Amino acid sequence: MYTAINQASNVRSYELSSIKACISGAAPLPIEVQESFEKLTRGRLVEGYGLTEASPVTHSNPLYGLRKVGTIGVPIPNTDAKIVDLVTGEDLPNGKVGELIVKGPQIMSGYWGTEHEDEAESILRDGWLYTGDVAVMDSDGYFQIISRKRDTIMTGVYSVYPRDVEEVLYENNKVLEAAVVGVGQENGEQKIKAFVVPRPNTSLTKEELIALCKRRLEEYAVPWEIEFREILPKSFVGKVLRRLLTEDKDEGEK
């Protein structure tokens, strides 16, 4: 939504001074989108976090306190959160990447209907909701979402998180939207593919994006392929549906 507002035709002709503060969720908020929106409206835009199973919010950056760009902020009142090992489930210290789990009065007690009991048991343990999101907490208690567990790209022995690559792509001001996915190979490994929507009336090339990634990323994190699209598939709340991008790739190979 914020990207759409930033890019709306004649948006500067509208009176936007009534916008004082907004919160973004549902998908990672690119820093470039945040900065453009705040410059446009003179209001505050902060990133938060939540999920349907948490009714639906657990974290937010303070609107007028310490805001850390690129993070989801701190847990809201009466909510606990921590990072646990992706394999063992053991608590991890600050600075270590693992799975975000949350606990509080807003957490669901389960899914409606007995057919979902096994699914609920897999993500609810001792009152903690296992979010399926890979994250890290800093020394100030601010959390940063790295990736969905299922979206993490395994290339050789390395883990690549889509957001890290997408943030680099957004450094090119000709990029309107970007989404990065892992494309499966016959040997079980994945290659990194980026889908990019260029800004209208620009001369964006794949070569300049690859060159940018090579300057800013480790070699194993550089996309092996970039595909330009007019639009990216999204849910009704504006979240990019990565699975549809990978399904398109699979269909094309059949």
Regions found by a protein language model. Give the residues of each.
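Gly/Ser/Thr-rich phosphate-binding loop
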Residues: 6-67, 80
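Active-site glycine-centered loops adjacent to acidic/histidine catalytic or metal-binding residues
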Residues: 26, 50, 73, 133, ...
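Beta-strand->loop->alpha-helix junctions that form or flank phosphate-binding loops
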Residues: 46-53, 73-75, 181-184, 227
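Conserved ATP/PPi-binding loop(s) of AMP-dependent carboxylate-activating enzymes
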Residues: 74-78, 90-122, 158-160
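Acidic/polar alpha-helix N-cap and adjacent early helical turns
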Residues: 248-254
